[in-house]
Amino acid sequence: MSDKAIGFDISTITPETGAPAPDRLISGNPQFTTWNIEEAGGGIYSGIWQATPGKWRIEYDEWEYFHILEGYSVVTEDGGDAIHLRAGDRLILRPGFKGTWEVVETTRKDYVVRV
């Protein structure tokens, strides 16, 4: 591959780990694992993210497209309907989105974020 075509081989990437900020945690003990594949200049990021079960508040300042690879999650906008996400589902969250993310079954997604 060249520097113009980048594969998604996470076995060659050291993952970052984390969790929701304590003030955003609603339930459970969710743990995040993120394999950042691309951090291009100009504020575009892509990679693979995985989370274990739990529920927390989310507030988006950025634009994100993602594709669920495995698992089951529920994203609910404040005052809106629940969006049930399973393998194969895709979603875009725009800046200003506020709500909750609940991982029911460990979920893995690939993503592209524009800040």
How should these model regions be labeled?
Residues A51, D61-V75:
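Short, conserved beta-strand element in jelly-roll/cupin
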Residues S46-I48, Y65, R90:
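Conserved hydrophobic/aromatic beta-strand scaffold that supports enzyme active sites
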